[in-house]
Amino acid sequence: MEASGTDEVDKLKTKFISAWNNMKYSWVLKTKTYFSRNSPVLLLGKCYHFKYEDESKMLPARSGCAIEDHVIAGNVEEFRKDFISRIWLTYREEFPQIEASALTTDCGWGCTLRTGQMLLAQGLILHFLGRAWTWPDALHIENADSDSWTSNTVKKFTASFEASLSGDRELRTPAVSLKETSGKCPDDHAVRNEAYHRKIISWFGDSPVAVFGLHRLIEFGKKSGKKAGDWYGPAVVAHILRKAVEEARHPDLQGLTIYVAQDCTVYNSDVIDKQTDSVTAGDARDKAVIILVPVRLGGERTNTDYLEFVKGVLSLEYCVGIIGGKPKQSYYFAGFQDDSLIYMDPHYCQSFVDVSIKDFPLETFHCPSPKKMSFRKMDPSCTIGFYCRNVQDFERASEEITKMLKISSKEKYPLFTFVNGHSKDFDFTSTAASEEDLFSEDERKNFKRFSTEEFVLL
């Protein structure tokens, strides 16, 4: 009985934490973000200009920009559609209990895992759908006006807290508020795209069976000494994502791998080996690779000299975003305008959605409004992600990224480098992990180092 009472206290405590976080972050979500019409907006490799959209000097945050070889001028709706189409993964509550804990929410501690999920989700979007893909229903999401965000938050948590007191533990999925446009796909290609869209989101479901779900990521984190409720830094999450992809058994995921840079160095031969390790005479296709590079943009604070570097990274068509944030908060950085970064915030706590249900609601997996913050507020610890479809794509990307690093670096040495050869050629050999021990001894040492370096996340 005593243990049961303790569990109930813990559950009530998480309710209060969730309520506080939602009250706090709903104000941020409802606050309008403004974009200048005189500066380009860049979003994951595409560039949008709003200069010719209208005569107002400022545009509300529901518009944005993206980067590529071409510029999209004067079309706020195109940016908005592009931004909303990115997959948004946030705190959730009332999901199945995490093993070896009483936790049914990640509110207050899971934000870096969520931003890592968002980066991986963007890599999967590129892999299966391509950068040009946008969600047909993106512009039909209900407006997150100032009244609805706040009132819904209050109503939701009043009901949620009352339910916890009465012992009502029923799981509820949010009602669909999208216009009834689904199911009217014009062709087989659109049907296929929507199927992959749903499949990708389902891989991040909050249940033990989801290949990239929170429960699975926490299991991999245990191998590094982490547990549910602990804080995770960007570098640790990079290694957890790598293990999650390596261990994924879904047939659609066999053509993808993840490489994590060692000490800010990408060893080209190691990357190519990962891309070609399963190539046979009957199947000459290379694997696609997501390259994750943990870096530090300064000492205690971010060095503003690295601003051009961050801009350069987010301007590349290969970029899938940055796991970063500001002290005590993790964000998924996807673009910029002038000296401000554009991000998606995982701190808004939403209800559990059962993604195993056919036609589960998609609305809560897409953010209706981008947010901006000054580069100066960025915490120096972050992880940068790139996607390359094949070996040829990787070779081209490494050349382009190297040029960008040289141009943007004001220091004698760039933040990270691409080096020909294998890591073992430079005496950085890491012990191979056995099936029982998913992380090598060197990786365990890295986890301990990363844990002491990185900021605390709430």
Swiss-Prot record:
Single biological process term from Gene Ontology: proteolysis
EC class name: hydrolase
Annotated positions of the Phosphothreonine modification: 452
Post-translational modification N-acetylmethionine, affected residues: 1
Entry GO MF terms: cysteine-type endopeptidase activity; cysteine-type peptidase activity; protein-phosphatidylethanolamide deconjugating activity
Chief subcellular location: cytoplasm
Keywords: Acetylation, Autophagy, Cytoplasm, Hydrolase, Phosphoprotein, Protease, Protein transport, Thiol protease, Transport, Ubl conjugation pathway
Any Pfam family hit: ATG4_LIR
Gene Ontology cellular-component terms listed: cytoplasm
Catalytic activity: [protein]-C-terminal L-amino acid-glycyl-phosphatidylethanolamide + H2O = [protein]-C-terminal L-amino acid-glycine + a 1,2-diacyl-sn-glycero-3-phosphoethanolamine
Its biological purpose: Cysteine protease that plays a key role in autophagy by mediating both proteolytic activation and delipidation of ATG8 family proteins. The protease activity is required for proteolytic activation of ATG8 family proteins: cleaves the C-terminal amino acid of ATG8 proteins MAP1LC3 and GABARAPL2, to reveal a C-terminal glycine. Exposure of the glycine at the C-terminus is essential for ATG8 proteins conjugation to phosphatidylethanolamine (PE) and insertion to membranes, which is necessary for autophagy. In addition to the protease activity, also mediates delipidation of ATG8 family proteins.
UniProt name for this protein: Cysteine protease ATG4C
Gene it is expressed from: Atg4c
